[in-house]
């Protein structure tokens, strides 16, 4: 129910450390393109909710739905940023990434011992990415 599909930005704020990205929706294909920062390509979200062209919206994305990598991913929902802070909790790492517009987006990953690549650290340039269905579109 509510946990997977929160229906208001107010509610989403209280559900874990959800990322909220503010933007403007434009109908596109199977969902909406969301303009969210100057000179950045739009993000895309699939939803069954109806939004009008040019309507303000919020994208809510849980940190564990966001992938973080040093190489540019092959997906349309990708944002370049810099690691600002890292929080370790048990077997989870939460990366606080500064993205265009001086915003912070949190990405959470499970720590695995078989990480052959160098661990991410502060000030690293990274890419955040997620699937078209990972973000929930909310009205203002």
Please give the residue ranges for each predicted region.
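Short acidic-hydrophobic catalytic motif
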Residues: 1-4, 12-15
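Non-catalytic connector elements of ABC transporters
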Residues: 18-20, 27-140
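ATP phosphate-binding glycine-rich loop
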Residues: 8
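N-terminal sensory regulatory modules of PAS/LOV and PAS-like folds
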Residues: 11, 25
